[in-house]
């Protein structure tokens, strides 16, 4: 048993049971109060005694660790408490430190059932005491805000003006030690292949969990196409699955391809990935409506949602809605609600139609069943996914005139649309629900119901007379907006940027006051050139402008409005067709849209060029002179770009790649023959490849290692042949050789895209170790598997006994590691010496010549010396004579004894 583990003592267990009992009692009382009928007020008001309690969560805790104090009042919950409204108890905690000093925590406000908890971090070693104080309370029904229409029929109205007397708890002692209390042992991040669900006990695994929700969900601040989690460092293919007919068609048509796409009628692949499932709309070429569901880890089709007729859920039942037609997936959502009585996330899918874009339909992402709809969705504003996962749209509205503006800041909220009652509003962080008829602060969307979204505003507040549009949103902090201004032959119109407060006050309400307002003069656009304002980067305090004609960029200070760097040196002429940008970790990433292939990185605060990426060229088939570069996504310090111009020729030119670039230095990490964009989730890249109209999943796959030893039982001093295989266990090419990262591109193109098998492909490094019979570990060294997946190693075991040999592949960017173990035996070598034959017969030869002593082989000698064994015919004659005399003596003695007994 580990000496570092601290187990709960029976007293502590009893304390936990007491806490649980009190909480259950409080909840029971709360339920009683909820359903208690209203009665008339008390005249005169009543007075109640009270009992205050406090319990430290841990009797013993380490210095610097967080202690939790649980406190409650030993009476019924506050009589007017109802949801977020009504009275609350308040408490103070007096903590006495070992050195005699004291500190007070509070006031601490209870929850609706009359209790609460808080944290305290001790800084001294020794015994602490804590005492809870309740200062008393006269019920008035409103410290936490009036219950709407509070009156005689309201919860607890009869208790108004009743008084609850002050009380103080007994002191409770807890001990702080120098040694820390043992915490929950965190499961290490996976080194083997993993799939969802991620066990909820693995709190520390959250950085590797990532979904692709589409829409504004992938927007990080003012930037777009961001992904969470990890991203693959290799073009290793997990699987591919047909998306449609593709590739070369028929000898009659030569090198012409199956239909892929065009400027107007394209095969659009915009997948959404939720909890290990891929959802994507049926390609336009199929001439049918609906969407597919694939398993992220295998590519297996799980479901097809047919929207050309009645919608059937995965469970086999028809939706009561009767059918959903002409719908296409628009985005996905994870709604993470932390409510008083309900906590957790809900994965949803949303669909729309071109005919009714302001009506959204919501589906259960697990069962695929239709749930409800929102009509009159706000179509204006800047889309943002809130911290709780709600889909928000921030918008500026002028309720007045241009001459006399009356400006309002609105935040339209999908969750508010489903909860709206007309009298209550949910806070943006999702802390409270106000759905009509719902008194339990729970999320319960009505099934097959259409909600009116015209009132779904979680924020609708008057603001100062600002101009322009919203540029960036930081939920619960601020919103930045403004105008671009102009600077040309007609004169200068200063631009303006401003920020409004989004922090809520103590009651949870937001008053969007003006935080700051700056003006600036944009770069000159004289001479019929186009200067465009870019993104606003509040973290680095910069905003910028770009010009496609001059291929230049200017940086401005968000604090002063002054130009702080630029213009940059003109770069790729192909920037004329567009200069899309991203801000990532203090860098301004610039792409040459459509026709150019370059990617540039500038220091966002100084304008210094950090690196420039030029795609590698193969052949001269691109009609643009180089390979176009468009952003797919940024994730895990990697920039993914693809070469897919607006117009695709038939046959398509060759040399289009999905490319992965190191965001810190612009070095190409890998590329793969792939025509089309891609998205990232759970460490995988998923994209449609127009070269063959197949869906590819790139990422780190599982591997398998085998091992054999020959012979199974060897003689000491003989060699053992250790051999085995290391193979790819990914669904797409299970059982094929595992190949080194350096050979992955060519190998994957060979396996999946009918390209030539690489002649110089190498396998992976295998480390072999042995455990000898004495328990000693021996490193047998490394060997590399070949392009067939085989490896081999010769070894001579030093001592006899049973050995265990392990072959380990530690993994690579393409594969997770694997290992295998085998046992074999080594027998002790036989002690064999050269035979010594008898000497020829001679009267002078000694009959008692000594035999040659056997030579003992050293235990660790690689080649034991033979043992000399004398032949049976060489036994000396004296030996036989001695044996005969002994027998005669024994017989004579026995006879003498027998005669003596007879005479007696």
Regions found by a protein language model. Name each.
Residues 191-216, 252-291, 313-360, 381-412, ...:
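Repeat-blade elements of multi-bladed beta-propeller folds
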Residues 39-51, 696-704:
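Proline/serine/threonine-rich low-complexity linkers at boundaries of modular beta-sandwich domains
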Residues 4, 10, 891-904:
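C-terminal membrane-anchoring or membrane-association module
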Residues 128-161, 799, 803-817:
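Enriched for extracellular/lumenal, surface-exposed ectodomains of secreted and cell-surface proteins
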Residues 117-124, 128, 134, 785, ...:
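Residue-level recognition of secondary-structure-to-loop junctions
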Residues 72-84, 725-759:
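Short amphipathic, basic-aromatic surface patches that mediate peripheral association
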Residues 665-715, 721:
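Blade-level signature of beta-propeller repeat domains, shared across WD40, Kelch, NHL, RCC1
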Residues 65-69, 718-722:
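Structural beta-strand segments of beta-rich domains
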